[in-house]
Amino acid sequence: MGGHSFTFKQFHIDQDRCAMKVGTDSIVLGSWTPVRGAKRILDIGTGTGILALMLAQRTAQQVQIDAVELDKDAVKQAEENINASPWRERIRVIRHDIRTFQAPHYDLIISNPPYFVHGQTLPDAARQLARHTGELDQTALLESAARLLTPFGKLALVLPVEEGEQLVALATAGGWYLQRRCRVETKRGKAPNLVLLLLSRKPAETEEEQLCLRETDNRYSPEFIALADEFYLRMSA
């Protein structure tokens, strides 16, 4: 989903100054993450603001959303995208390193976190900052979330499958519990390449799920349409 902009049913994303563009991974995460009962939400590494905007669309007027981002160009673009949306009064964009960010506790934290490993060559410095695990590794992400969540709060993430397995192992060792795991296949019959994770600090049995995005003929699958139709301008089975 490259290009300089992306239009959804209720909001528009400009992304010409953001290193990481709107992708299916964020759209799936923003559609899948449970928001019931959440009064305060934190988006870690907001980028264009896509996840903050999706959750604003899905939640009641009194829900407050903080969107934290380190890159100054992404912060400016996220602010512009949010200010042009119907939810500008509910979303606050904050330029800060999440590792030292302080705020009242959140009921829900959502993130499409860094997932490139050390040694990978990336096109430019901004993209490297946005996606290099040296900037926010899994340990730092989990520690930040644990510090900022309420006791019953939840952490929702999307990662490539292998990185997701690594994070679950790390989280389990650190006292987290995996509530839900959804393996995502881009096309029917292909091996999953993404995983959606919902973690909490309270004991829970893991719900295992599977999501297919497209059929073999490249049409959106019925389950993906049911999940994301409130956002996409055009989806048809």
Curated annotation (Swiss-Prot):
InterPro entries listed in its UniProt record: DNA_methylase_N6_adenine_CS, SAM-dependent_MTases_sf, Small_mtfrase_dom, tRNA_Adenine-N(6)_MTase, tRNA_adenine-N6_MeTrfase
GO (cellular component) term, any one: cytoplasm
Enzyme category, top tier: transferase
Record key words, sorted: Cytoplasm, Methyltransferase, S-adenosyl-L-methionine, Transferase, tRNA processing
MF annotations from Gene Ontology: nucleic acid binding; tRNA (adenine-N6)-methyltransferase activity
Gene Ontology biological process terms in this record: methylation; tRNA processing
EC number annotated for this UniProt entry: 2.1.1.223
Catalytic reactions on record: adenosine(37) in tRNA1(Val) + S-adenosyl-L-methionine = N(6)-methyladenosine(37) in tRNA1(Val) + S-adenosyl-L-homocysteine + H(+)
A Pfam family recorded for this sequence: MTS
Superkingdom assignment: Bacteria
Compartmental location: Cytoplasm
Family that this chain belongs to: Belongs to the methyltransferase superfamily. tRNA (adenine-N(6)-)-methyltransferase family.
HAMAP family registered for this protein in UniProt: tRNA_methyltr_YfiC
Free-text function comment from the UniProt entry: Specifically methylates the adenine in position 37 of tRNA(1)(Val) (anticodon cmo5UAC).
The protein, known as: tRNA1(Val) (adenine(37)-N6)-methyltransferase
